[in-house]
């Protein structure tokens, strides 16, 4: 059974720049005007990452555009947003992030079946330049393979 996801924003650069070792889902604390802006698809998580502050996890650099029909008390576009996770998950994440070279990256933001905004996070390790070149070669080879199969 496939799970319903209405994708709002994706971070395609994260897959290119990092080895994603583990994926997890988290809720996010939002204001009303932010939700309305997300329904219009006006969000970007290209440069966003998550970090811990004690025993909470926040999402940084996530851009949600201002909702044009909101009043003068609109939200700030790049404010840190709290992620909703279970305590065991937070402890596990903090343990993994504290290891040198690991980071917590936002991979996608979407509405789930109950119309709640969720963020897919990935515990990731940065790629070196030669790893990025290998992934480019692999992507080109897959593209060439599909062309050869179509020609036959």
From Swiss-Prot:
It comes from the Bacteria. This is SsrA-binding protein. It is found in: Cytoplasm. HAMAP family: SmpB. Gene3D superfamilies: 2.40.280.10. GO terms for biological process: trans-translation. The gene is smpB. PROSITE patterns: SSRP. The keyword Repressor does not apply.
